[in-house]
């Protein structure tokens, strides 16, 4: 996208954090009380300023739209129910490569395991992961429920979606 080979791409808030650290603020656990609050933030000046800052820094990305990718992140596990933070002790939980997401799992006693989304199904089926942090829609859509036995609907993170256009392509329009 930055080089102009792709015109558009979608990232989550957490995914953007690998490129633009300040985006992590959008992925702080339990920041948004509900959809209405999250949508108010997404439609407000914070996201507009973030998009402008990314463009001004020359990262080659132009923010086009912000939405939701399918709900809220919650913990889903293969072998044990989570009723307290102690239940996460030593569990290998899939995270994004975001330092914030990894630190959250670590602080709860789990073992953060950054893994590409395309590898999560296999990792759960092979026992390489004990759980993940995804929305119910993601769990069902990727058939993770075939291996997931427990779901703690804690809604710790709003799964915001940002649609980006290549600045290189934009300049050719």
How does the language model describe each region?
Residues 7, 12-111, 123, 144, ...:
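Contiguous mixed-secondary-structure segments that line small-molecule binding/active-site clefts
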Residues 2, 13-21, 118-125, 132-150:
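A ligand-binding cleft/hinge motif common to bilobed small-molecule-binding domains
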Residues 113-116:
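Short acidic-hydrophobic, aromatic-tinged amphipathic segments that line or gate anion-handling sites
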């Amino acid at each position: 996208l930055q080089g102009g080979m792709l015109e558009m791409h979608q990232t989550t808030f957490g995914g953007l954090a690998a490129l633009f650290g300040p985006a992590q603020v959008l992925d702080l656990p339990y920041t948004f009380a509900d959809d209405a609050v999250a949508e108010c933030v997404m439609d407000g000046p914070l996201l507009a300023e973030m998009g402008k800052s990314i463009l001004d820094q020359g990262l080659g990305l132009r923010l086009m739209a912000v939405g939701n990718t399918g709900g809220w992140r919650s913990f889903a596990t293969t072998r044990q129910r989570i009723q307290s933070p102690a239940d996460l002790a030593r569990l290998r939980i899939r995270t994004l490569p975001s330092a914030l997401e990894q630190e959250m799992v670590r602080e709860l006693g789990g073992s953060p395991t950054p893994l590409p989304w395309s590898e999560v199904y296999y990792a759960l089926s092979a026992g390489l992961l004990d759980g993940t942090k995804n929305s119910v829609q993601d769990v069902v859509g990727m058939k993770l429920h075939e291996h997931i036995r427990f779901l703690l609907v804690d809604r710790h993170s709003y799964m915001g979606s940002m649609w980006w256009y290549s600045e290189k392509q934009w300049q050719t329009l």
